[in-house]
Regions:
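Structural motif
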Residues: 89-93, 137-145, 187-203
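Charge-biased low-complexity segments
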Residues: 327-444
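Acidic, glycine-anchored loop motifs typical of Ca2+
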Residues: 120-132, 136, 169-179, 429
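Repeated scaffold domains used in trafficking and secretory/extracellular systems
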Residues: 112-119, 161-169
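Acidic, small-residue rich beta-repeat scaffolds with periodic aromatic anchors
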Residues: 54-77, 81-84, 180-332
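N-terminal secretory signal peptides that target proteins for export/translocation
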Residues: 1-32
């Protein structure tokens, strides 16, 4: 049974909105006071340990476990949770949008269903709900379905073939990207399954004027880190032995004991390095790296196979390539302060005037963390941690800071925030970036 942590919203109160009390002040155990408004109350689940790579991403509902419901200001509601057959919940997931007495079923018997974004501007001209659905447990990939949140909701776009999808304003420049991978194109490639790979080819997408564009080349530092990580796992001996093989590594190939598994790992990492170059828009560097590391006798075959696989994947669904914005031309999204509560000042605030909060604060969609393992980790997890989060306009955590006089940091909790999902803050009906305080403690 999953354990959970309870979280309490942390808010600064002030006599007026100009109060600038330090955000770094130590935070004691939080209790709601009469008249004080909390940003939100959340629960953080401890995930059961798993070795399955495909389950490394957090989703709202997996095999009938987990649920989420929310309503947008237009009256359109979303529900993701266990599918119901009569009065019974099943081991599959359902997702639906509803408005008034109408209902739009997105999936009613899926292995996984998830809300990635809700009320977010993806560049399609309307606030949207982005849901991802995996139809069966044996399938490799998700379908990413984007619906308008105007009544009645309309399916605006579907992207197929990624193992996961995650919308985020990565650089806090006001533009939202969709991070995914080209998993469907490489599933079974060279007899390698997705669970054999460290990662499928990463991709970064972005909508502009309704067109789905490839923005991967704008995030080359991300790809460079992936390349460096894979190169660090290879030795000169590994590469030399692989270069002297036939490249195919067919089961019937005569190799010394232990070599097939080792060379298979080398082959996998060489492919991952080449993919990172190719998918980040550096084809010349990719083909050069392939020639340096792949057996010469098999080079033409593998190059043709890579090209053939790419045209079957997400690349075939794109409308073009995003044009990078120069560093000097980039906007910087305003980060609204959700740590201050504006309250009436006795004797100064006119009667009948209610102070207005600058933003509608974020609300959690999904917050999960892996279980602590060691005694020290368990002790840290049982104590309250106070976090300062910056949440972007797509509802993803862009930065996290542990507040207070803490001796040790719960590293597992901090790391897990990278996969947390929120309905973003809103200002004047528009999704915005915000910063909030969040107190997290073990639910008792």
């Amino acid at each position: 049974m999953a354990k959970s942590c309870q979280t309490h919203s942390r808010c600064k109160t002030s006599e007026n909105s100009s109060n600038q009390a330090s955000a770094r002040a130590p935070c004691a155990s939080f209790r709601l006071r009469p008249g004080a408004a909390a940003i939100a109350v959340f629960f953080v689940l401890w995930l059961l340990p798993t070795v399955c790579r495909a389950q490394s991403r957090d989703v709202v509902c997996r095999e009938g476990v987990g649920d989420f419901e929310a309503e947008f200001l237009t009256g359109v509601r979303v529900r993701v949770g266990p599918a119901r057959f009569g009065d019974l919940e099943s081991r599959v997931c359902a997702a639906a949008l509803s408005w008034g007495d109408q209902n739009l079923v997105i999936g009613d018997s899926a292995a996984q269903a998830d809300v990635d974004a809700f009320g977010v501007d993806l560049g399609l001209g309307a606030p949207v709900a982005a849901l991802q659905v995996k139809k069966s447990k044996g399938e490799c990939c998700m379908e990413y379905r984007i619906y308008s949140l105007r009544a009645p909701p309309v399916l605006l776009h579907t992207i197929r073939g990624g193992e996961f999808f995650s919308a985020a304003d990565t650089d806090l420049d006001g533009r939202v990207e969709i991070w995914t991978d080209d998993a469907a194109s490489v599933e079974g490639f060279e007899n390698l399954r997705l669970h054999d790979l460290d990662f499928a080819p990463p991709m970064v997408l972005r909508f502009a004027r309704g067109r789905l564009l490839n923005a991967s080349s704008e995030f080359r530092s991300f790809y460079d880190q992936k390349i460096a990580d894979e190169r660090a796992k290879l030795t000169a001996q590994d590469l030399g032995d692989f270069k002297n093989s036939d490249g195919r590594l067919a089961p019937a190939t005569a190799l010394p004991p232990g070599w097939p598994l080792r060379l298979r790992s080398v082959k996998m990492r060489v492919l991952e390095i080449v993919w990172c170059y190719l998918y980040s828009g550096r084809e010349e560097a990719g083909w050069r790296s392939l020639a340096e590391m792949w057996p010469a006798s098999d080079l033409d075959r593998i190059r043709a196979a890579i090209l053939s696989a790419r045209v079957r994947g997400i690349l075939s669904q794109l409308d073009g390539i995003s044009v990078p914005v120069s560093a000097g031309g980039k906007n910087h999204a305003k980060i609204f302060d959700g740590t201050v509560i504006v309250s009436a000042t006795p004797g100064l605030t006119p009667k009948g005037v209610k102070p207005k909060q600058e933003i509608t604060p974020p609300k959690a969609i999904l917050m999960e963390r892996p279980p602590p393992v060691t005694a020290v980790e368990i002790e840290l997890a049982q104590s309250e941690s106070t976090l300062k989060l910056v949440i972007d306009s797509a509802g993803k955590v862009r930065s996290v800071e542990v507040l207070g006089a803490v001796q040790s940091v719960d590293a597992g909790l901090v790391k897990s925030t990278a996969n947390w999902k929120f309905i973003p803050a809103f200002s004047n009906g528009e999704p915005v970036a915000s910063q909030i305080f969040l107190g997290v403690s073990l639910k008792r």
